[in-house]
Regions:
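Charged, helix-prone or intrinsically disordered regulatory segments positioned adjacent to compact structured domains
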Residues: 2-77
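Charge-dense, extended regions
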Residues: 70-129
C-alpha cells in the first residue's frame, strides 16, 4: 500500500517543534515543501501556527515573517494571522552570533517582515526558496 506524501503546514511545523524536533529541521522541511510543491502553497500557510510554550514564540514569529515574505514573492494573499501582534518579539533575536559589525549587517540587510518582528536574520535566510 502506497502512502501519499502530506506537505508540512505552518501548523504542523510548530507541532513538530513542540514535539522536540530540532526547530531548524522542521523549518527547513516547511521551506522545502513551499519550494517544491507550488500547488500546495496556499494550504501550507492557511492555518495559524499555535504555540503554548514561551520558548516556541520565536519560531512562531519566524514562521509568520517567512510566510509574509514568501507570499509577497509569489503574489499570493498574505494570511491574516501573520499580522497578529503575538507574532512580534519583545526582545531582539539575532539568528547569527556576533556583535558589532555582524549585528550592523543583520540590521541593514534583514527584510522588513523579519525586522518588524524583531528578528534579525540578514538577507540570506530564504535565498534557496
Amino acid at each position: 500500500m502506497k502512502t501519499a506524501y502530506r506537505p508540512q503546514t505552518t501548523s504542523e511545523t510548530m507541532a513538530r517543534i513542540a514535539a522536540g524536533v530540532d526547530p531548524w529541521i522542521a523549518y527547513r522541511d516547511f521551506l522545502e515543501d513551499w519550494t517544491y510543491l507550488p500547488e500546495s502553497r496556499r494550504d501550507l500557510v492557511a492555518a495559524r501556527p499555535p504555540w503554548t510554550r514561551r520558548e516556541h514564540e520565536r519560531w512562531a514569529s519566524l514562521l509568520a515573517a517567512t510566510v509574509e515574505v514568501l507570499c509577497a514573492r509569489e503574489d499570493l494573499p498574505v494570511p491574516a494571522w501573520t499580522s497578529d501582534p503575538r507574532y512580534r518579539l519583545a526582545e531582539p533575536w539575532y539568528l547569527y552570533a556576533g556583535t558589532g559589525r555582524m549585528r550592523e549587517w543583520l540590521r541593514e540587510s534583514t527584510p522588513g517582515p523579519f525586522a518588524e518582528r524583531n528578528i534579525w536574520s540578514g538577507d540570506r535566510l530564504l535565498r534557496r526558496t
